[in-house]
Amino acid sequence: ANIVFDVESATTGTYSTFLTSF
């Protein structure tokens, strides 16, 4: 996942994965 959205990944892994897709 993105480092900036690392905190978001801890809460919702799906959100982090979605940003990584782009």
From Swiss-Prot:
GO biological process, one term: defense response
Gene Ontology molecular function terms on file: rRNA N-glycosylase activity; toxin activity
Enzyme Commission number(s) from the entry: 3.2.2.22
Function: Nicks pBR322 dsDNA. Has adenine polynucleotide glycosidase activity on herring sperm ssDNA.
Enzyme class name: hydrolase
First-listed, main subcellular location of the protein, grouped into a coarse class: secreted
Keyword Hydrolase assigned: yes
Localization in the cell: Secreted, Extracellular space; Golgi apparatus; Vacuole
Keywords for the protein's UniProt record, in alphabetical order: Golgi apparatus, Hydrolase, Plant defense, Protein synthesis inhibitor, Secreted, Toxin, Vacuole
Reaction catalysis annotation: Endohydrolysis of the N-glycosidic bond at one specific adenosine on the 28S rRNA
GO cellular component: extracellular region; Golgi apparatus; vacuole
Similarity section: Belongs to the ribosome-inactivating protein family. Type 1 RIP subfamily.
Hydrolase is among the record's keywords: yes
Name the UniProt record assigns to this protein: Dioicin-1
